[in-house]
């Protein structure tokens, strides 16, 4: 239940701008957040493998 309440709290506008913290837009995970995509590493990896993120492909060198 705490996770659901924290997700709801993160969606509200904060009283002060500096209090805003990043959460994944898909699952609500607070850690391993990628700013460029607005999601956590797990959701990013899943969507990248499915080809749903334009311009992202698996690196090989």
Curated annotation (Swiss-Prot):
The keyword Zinc applies. InterPro entries: Ribosomal_uS14, Ribosomal_uS14_bact, Ribosomal_uS14_CS, Ribosomal_uS14_sf. The keyword rRNA-binding applies. One of its GO terms (biological process) is translation. Transmembrane segments: none annotated. Gene3D superfamilies: 30s Ribosomal Protein S14, Chain N. Keywords: Metal-binding, Ribonucleoprotein, Ribosomal protein, RNA-binding, rRNA-binding, Zinc. GO terms for molecular function: rRNA binding; structural constituent of ribosome; zinc ion binding. Binds 1 zinc ion per subunit. GO terms for cellular component: cytoplasm; small ribosomal subunit. Part of the 30S ribosomal subunit. Contacts proteins S3 and S10. Binds 16S rRNA, required for the assembly of 30S particles and may also be responsible for determining the conformation of the 16S rRNA at the A site. NCBIfam families: PRK08061.1. PANTHER family: 30S RIBOSOMAL PROTEIN S14 (PTHR19836), SMALL RIBOSOMAL SUBUNIT PROTEIN US14M (PTHR19836:SF19). This is Small ribosomal subunit protein uS14.
